[in-house]
Structures are given as structure tokens and as C-alpha cells.
């Protein structure tokens, strides 16, 4: 059957080659260059800021790095060959390129879906089951899960090595080489449908259910008590601080923790929603074409589907920058755009030694550093009666 199919695909065609409109080529090249270029830079920055910034190395960010690598793979393996196809009108990467590039395309697509599923489950456990999260949602476990995700998708996508071949079509005015299938559509359509179910329908249903539970906990009910909330209380080892200040600070800290978790959940939910929406045109087209005798292949609609896929892979760094204060600060620092403080440094300093425990959550990505330093310093006034070095230092609270 395979030999018959190859001979049918490679048969000489004496009709003139269909010419793609110039405006279609220009629009394709410009859009793909802009979206893929920005997406590649943005996803590289995500990987760098998490790898180089210690406080950014959290389980959730570990999954976001996996997602960024998968998106990079999609942008490079799917976006850039689209440009050469538009310029030359033929496949220019040879047989090995056909196998490897297609493999990397599907590897990136499926790994991104699995990464989204992984951080959705991690968020659900961290927020809805905080006691279990103490040993389930750890950085080391996140790395193991990511290794499993990439190993599974790498093995699964090897299926495409056995389905692809170069197809040569001879026209009156040219010979066109394309990277396509060496089996008929009746055989590879079920594979598309399986991909649609495993890497789109199931993750989206799971995300809808889990984010429903998360929303109920965060926005409708009080957040479950974290066992660390009871063990990590503010230590009052100095008589310089009164009890009311400690209580108020602890309340502010708890409220900040809840607010941070809500913001992180919103950010990740936006990532999932955009994934569902931007992949919907292509996935729908694949399902519809599986039941049509002649597949629908209108050029402009196919371009729209591709652009949606590239946008999905390029937009996540923008979401992180808009919705995460930590990512925004890390991006600024990476670009050396951090503004210098406008205040002049003090001529001399006074050490204020307070024993403060920082409230943190090792299994979640917090957007704001939770600290009470500013609260304590605002309650402690430091005045300098003279500008000379022998000036007297007085505190309003003794």
C-alpha cells in the first residue's frame, strides 16, 4: 500500500503549477517573522530569568520553563520553515530535515500541552490540598515530572518518523518538493484524532475541572490553612515591638499570601484559556477534514490557523510580564533596564537588628516578596539631630 501511495503522490502532473498570490507571501513572511522573532526572544528570557534568579526557582516556574522550551521548539521548527516555503514554494531541507523538523514540531506541541497540564495539577494540589503539597509540590519532584513529560512525548512523537516522506510533483514550469505523508489520509487521520483527544480535549477538560475547584477555594471559600502558618509565627524576641504591631503584620502577611496565590492562579488560567482558544481553529480543522472526502485547504484560513499557533507560543512571556511582578522585575534586571534609585545614599547608617521571619511558600509562585521590613521601619523613627558624624541618634520607641 505504501509503494502505491508513493507512486500516486510522485506522479508527473502536466498542468501548470498554482501560483500563490504575492500579497499572501508578503503577509505570511511579515507576520511569521514578527511573531516568531518576538516569541523566540521572550521565551529565551523566561528560561534565563528562572535559571539565573534563585528566588524564581519554584515548582510552578519549573513547569513554565518547560513550557517556554516547548514553545521555542514550535516557533523554530514550525514558524521558520513556513517562511522558506513562502519564499521558495518548495521544501528545501531534504529528507532528514523533513523527518527531524516535523518531529520537533509535534514534540513541542505535545510537550507544551503536557506542561500546561502539569502546572495545572500542581496549582490544584498546592491550593486545595496544602498539606499534601508539602511533599508533592517540591522543586525536585517538579524536575522529575518534567523529565517524564519530555521522555513520554519524545517516544510518542517518534511515530512520525515512520509516516513521512518527500513528495515530488512535476509541473510544466517547475518541480515542487514537499514534506508529506507516505501513507493515505485514511491511515493518518486516526492519528490526528488521537492527538486531538490526548493533547487537547483531555487537558482542557482537566484544566476546566481543576480551575473550578481552585476558584471555589480562592474566591468563594477561605483559603485552607497551611500547616506552616501555625508553625512559622512572628517571633517577638525583643521588647522593642508591641503585640499589636506583630498581629497587624501577621495579618498583612497572610492577606498578601492569599492575594499572591490569587494573582498566580489568574495568570496561569489566562495561559490555559489562550492555549484553548488559539489552538481551537487548527484542531477543529483537523477534525473536520478527517470526515471530508476532499479536505478544506483554503490558503488564508490555513495561514490564520498557523498564526494562532505561533501566537500561542509567543504570547506567554507577555502574560508573565503583565501579570507577574516578579517576572517583570526579573525581565528588567536581565535587560539591564532596572532604574537606579533617585534617593541619595546616606552618609552613614545605623544598623537596625530585628528578628523577622519571612513568610514564604516553597511550593507556589508568589508574585510579591512577603516581608514586614517596611512595616517595622515605618514604626521606628530614626532622627539625626546634627549633620556631623558625632550627631545623636534617637529612636521614638525605646
Swiss-Prot record:
This is Thyrotropin-releasing hormone receptor. It is a multi-pass membrane protein. InterPro entries: GPCR_Rhodpsn, GPCR_Rhodpsn_7TM, TRH_rcpt_1. It is found in: Cell membrane. It is linked to Hypothyroidism, congenital, non-goitrous, 7: A form of central hypothyroidism, a disorder characterized by sub-optimal thyroid hormone secretion, due to insufficient stimulation by thyrotropin of an otherwise normal thyroid gland. It may be caused by congenital or acquired disorders of the pituitary gland or hypothalamus. CHNG7 is a congenital, autosomal recessive form characterized by normal-to-low T4 and normal-to-high thyrotropin levels, and reduced or absent pituitary responsiveness to thyrotropin-releasing hormone. It comes from Homo sapiens. Disulfide bonds join 98-179. The gene is TRHR. GO terms for molecular function: thyrotropin-releasing hormone receptor activity. The keyword Kinase does not apply. Glycans are attached at residues 3, 10. It comes from the Eukaryota. The chain crosses the membrane at residues 29-51, 62-83, 100-121, 145-168, 194-215, 267-288, 297-319. Receptor for thyrotropin-releasing hormone (TRH). Upon ligand binding, this G-protein-coupled receptor triggers activation of the phosphatidylinositol (IP3)-calcium-protein kinase C (PKC) pathway. Residues 1-28, 84-99, 169-193, 289-296 are extracellular. One of its GO terms (biological process) is phospholipase C-activating G protein-coupled receptor signaling pathway. Keywords: Cell membrane, Congenital hypothyroidism, Disease variant, Disulfide bond, G-protein coupled receptor, Glycoprotein, Membrane, Receptor, Transducer, Transmembrane, Transmembrane helix. Its main location: membrane. Residues 52-61, 122-144, 216-266, 320-398 are cytoplasmic. Belongs to the G-protein coupled receptor 1 family. One of its GO terms (cellular component) is plasma membrane.
Amino acid at each position: 500500500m505504501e509503494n502505491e501511495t508513493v507512486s500516486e503522490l510522485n506522479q508527473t502532473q502536466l498542468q501548470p503549477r498554482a501560483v500563490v498570490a504575492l500579497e499572501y507571501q508578503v503577509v505570511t513572511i511579515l507576520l511569521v517573522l514578527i511573531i516568531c522573532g518576538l516569541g523566540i526572544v521572550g521565551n529565551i528570557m523566561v528560561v534565563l530569568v528562572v535559571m539565573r534568579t534563585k528566588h524564581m526557582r519554584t515548582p510552578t516556574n519549573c513547569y513554565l520553563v518547560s513550557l517556554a522550551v516547548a514553545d521555542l521548539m514550535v516557533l523554530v521548527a514550525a514558524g521558520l520553515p513556513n517562511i522558506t516555503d513562502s519564499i521558495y514554494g518548495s521544501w528545501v531541507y531534504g529528507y532528514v530535515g523533513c523527518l527531524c523538523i516535523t518531529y520537533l514540531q509535534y514534540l513541542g506541541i505535545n510537550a507544551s500541552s503536557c506542561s500546561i497540564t502539569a502546572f495545572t495539577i500542581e496549582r490544584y494540589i498546592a491550593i486545595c490540598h496544602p498539606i499534601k503539597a508539602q511533599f508533592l509540590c517540591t522543586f525536585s519532584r517538579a524536575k522529575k515530572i518534567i523529565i517524564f513529560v519530555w521522555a513520554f512525548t519524545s517516544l510518542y512523537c517518534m511515530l512520525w518518523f515512520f509516516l513521512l516522506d518527500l513528495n515530488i510533483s512535476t509541473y510544466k514550469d517547475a518541480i515542487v518538493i514537499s514534506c508529506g505523508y507516505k501513507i493515505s489520509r485514511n491511515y493518518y487521520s486516526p492519528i490526528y484524532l488521537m492527538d486531538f483527544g490526548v493533547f487537547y480535549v483531555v487537558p482542557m477538560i482537566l484544566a476546566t475541572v481543576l480551575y473550578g475547584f481552585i476558584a471555589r477555594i480562592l474566591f468563594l471559600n477561605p483559603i485552607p490553612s497551611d500547616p506552616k502558618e501555625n508553625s512559622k509565627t512572628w517571633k517577638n524576641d525583643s521588647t522593642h515591638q508591641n503585640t499589636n504591631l506583630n498581629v497587624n503584620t501577621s495579618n498583612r502577611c497572610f492577606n498578601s499570601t492569599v492575594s499572591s496565590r490569587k494573582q498566580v492562579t489568574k495568570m496561569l488560567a489566562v495561559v490555559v484559556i489562550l492555549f484553548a482558544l488559539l489552538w481551537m481553529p487548527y484542531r477543529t480543522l483537523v477534525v473536520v477534514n478527517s470526515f471530508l472526502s476532499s479536505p478544506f485547504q483554503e490558503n488564508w484560513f490555513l495561514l490564520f490557523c498557523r498564526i494562532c499557533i505561533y501566537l500561542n507560543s509567543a504570547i506567554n512571556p507577555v502574560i508573565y510580564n503583565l501579570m507577574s511582578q516578579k517576572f517583570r522585575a526579573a525581565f528588567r534586571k536581565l535587560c539591564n533596564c532596572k532604574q537606579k534609585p533617585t534617593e541619595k545614599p546616606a552618609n552613614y547608617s545605623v544598623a537596625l537588628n530585628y528578628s523577622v521571619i519571612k513568610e514564604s511558600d516553597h511550593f507556589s509562585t508568589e508574585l510579591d516578596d512577603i516581608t514586614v521590613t517596611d512595616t517595622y521601619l515605618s514604626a521606628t523613627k530614626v532622627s539625626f539631630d546634627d549633620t556631623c558624624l558625632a550627631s545623636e541618634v534617637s529612636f521614638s520607641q525605646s
